[in-house]
């Protein structure tokens, strides 16, 4: 079994790595972290990698890899091409393993537009969206398969543990400018509706340099 969790940059993984360091050894005695390879190794042989994908070209670093689980933390920090490329890496690394992807995210960010279109507005919350795919078979026929996705909304008030441990955090969010406050406190995906073509914003990989 192999899994991988992405943040936009490796530095942003700090909090996730701290939580993994707190949870994994207690739940899986004998689990160890290799700081050079950025991977947790478990006695069963399973591995969980942590990685950044700062530039779109970084996605090809994972060409030839296979992961049973792929996770994106703060999905709106990524472009669609970075996310969709990893579909090709989401395949079983052994018999009987479950293959799936998960992502978390907040409104705003360079990927706000495509994340909203793909998950938020495509169907009501908590409603599975099923897409039919036709896979070619060796005999020339096709096989129907389905991929599912779903949007699970959550607000700060849904995290009772955080509310109890840090009640001042809500006050901090309440003091933000209106658009940021509506996005982060209320989970409002329409607060950034005026940001058109967000996937193209400040992305050096998309620039075309004219040759002279």
Language-model features: where?
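Conserved RecA-like ASCE P-loop NTPase motor core of nucleic-acid helicases/translocases
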Residues: 1-13
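Inter-Walker segment of RecA-like/P-loop motor cores
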Residues: 11-68, 189
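Walker B catalytic acidic pair
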Residues: 73-74
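ASCE P-loop NTPase helicase motor core
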Residues: 77-159
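ATPase catalytic-site recognition across NTP-hydrolyzing enzymes
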Residues: 158-212
